[in-house]
Regions:
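Soluble extramembrane regions of membrane proteins in the secretory/endomembrane system
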Residues: 1-223
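Core alpha-helical transmembrane segments of integral membrane proteins
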Residues: 217-235
Length: 235
């Protein structure tokens, strides 16, 4: 894991979520842990540290029991193949050996209901946790990059920029894999100079091309402080 101090700097980057809301990475990482694991930290690590690690070592995080399972619904546990007393399950347990989603039938039926019952609500909640965790581990949700001259002020993730755009994004997007690789080395050497330089470069790009939707420094700081207060309040 990278240090908490360095992870905090990563948490100050801005992303655009699927609804178009602009938020600090720290807000997303906090929401991720709270919604998926029902906790503000994971084994003593901050949410920002965890999110960085997920993108460095996705295969590892597929195996980690981090998805909180609701009490009383043994059907979910039976379908995904975990112990009936298990409080948490790994993402991989929700898929079979061929990559098929084990809860597909139950969630399809649950989402069709206008007023789902408690049993169906449990499946919907589990499905949302699975999708949220997958979006984090895959990097799909990390929409760091404002699209130059986009009339809708859309931002994109590294995964969404695999085809040439004939803009400076074709170069800038590579900051993401470079950063996660550099952060691995930094966590071992304790020298975060290069990793922080990449974060600074990406932050400058966001401010230069983020347009009207980019968070101001005041709003960014206020939201991060609120996240810290919310965690402290629960201690």
């Amino acid at each position: 894991m990278v240090s908490a101090e360095h992870a905090e700097k990563f948490g100050r980057l801005v992303i655009q979520d699927y609804s178009g809301r602009m938020k600090p990475v720290n807000t997303f990482s906090s929401e991720l842990l709270r919604k998926v694991s029902k906790s503000d930290t994971f084994e003593g690590f901050t949410s920002d540290q965890v999110l960085i690690s997920m993108n460095q070592f996705p295969e590892f995080w597929y195996q980690i029991p981090i998805i909180h399972l609701v009490k009383g619904n043994d059907s979910i546990r039976k379908i995904i193949g975990v112990d009936k007393e298990a409080k948490y399950a790994p993402l991989i347990s929700f898929f079979d050996d061929f990559g098929n989603y084990k809860l597909q039938k139950q969630t399809d039926e649950a989402y069709k209901e206008v007023v789902p019952n408690k049993f169906q609500k449990d499946f919907i909640e589990a499905d949302k946790k699975v999708n949220l965790l997958y979006s984090a581990i895959s990097g799909q949700i990390l929409r760091f990059f404002p699209l130059p001259k986009d009339t809708n002020n859309k931002w994109a993730s590294y995964l969404e920029l695999q085809h040439p755009t004939k803009t400076n994004l074709d170069t800038v997007k590579n900051i993401i894999p470079f950063y996660f690789g550099e952060a691995v080395r930094a966590s071992q050497s304790k020298d975060y100079k290069n990793a922080e330089s990449l974060l600074t470069g990406l932050s400058k790009f966001q401010r230069e091309f983020g347009g009207k939707v980019m968070l101001s420094e005041d709003k960014l700081e206020a939201e991060i402080q609120y996240n810290k207060y919310d965690v402290f309040k629960k201690l």
